[in-house]
Amino acid sequence: RIVHVVYGRGREHEVIEVSTFRAYLDNAAAEQVAGNEKTSRSELAGMQHAVDSTGRVLRDNVWGPQEEDAVRRDFTINAMYYDPQTQVVVDYHKGIQDAKKRTLRMIGDPATRYREDPVRIIRAVRFAAKLSPLGFTLDAKTAAPLVQSQALLADVPQSRMFDEMLKLLQTGHALATIEQLKKLGMATGIYPLLDVVVERADTPFVNAALADTDRRVGEGKPVAPSFLLATVLWADVRDGWARRQERQPPFPALQDAIDDVFDKRIGDVSGRGKLAADMREIWVMQ
């Protein structure tokens, strides 16, 4: 269970996430389903521990002790616990040692952990980009299976992949993330729309939007995915608009060009309606 506790009042309040510890389960003993979270929803309803045909964990929310909860974490530096009463840091996986060495190391066998949850591949890139200014680098064994494991992301629901892409681009380290993807040999293959962002990141127009997004996050200002994605995909809209104007009036041609871009580049993801409305407004104003 996860509970969000509001601490304080007014603008100065904090939201503290409180959760129970969860058990580390042997995935070899899990029940297997043929589909994913959506296609096997009714089948998963009665299961505590289930994986799909690739070994990706779909259900494993079981209470457990702190030491097992630590094993479930992805990186050693993300598996430390602070006891506010004794003021002691509980470190089961040498996270402090790795932090001093500025090393991002996966707990357990990296290839297995990526198979259990392929989104860890994206988290590895995001952490490496975020902490690179502090000198952190991925451990060689953690980085080695990344490219080969990319294919596992094809089984992750598109809405989750879209959300994870936004985390890469809207947490203040978009440019560093793109450099990290190139460095790791992962400039393509994670998510089609992200491929477009990486491909166009060196163009002055898109690069300025990425830099501005990083700047706003650094200044504590809000950022909107509609602005960044509208910038990245404007070339598609502009070119489609020009083609359609050969046989349509300008405004209907623009609307149809926008629809084409949404269908081709973004697809059916949660929240598309609001996102589409905002992006459409930006493009129409051009």
Q: Which residues make up each language-model segment?
A:
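Catalytic cores of the polymerase beta-like nucleotidyltransferase superfamily
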Residues: 1-286
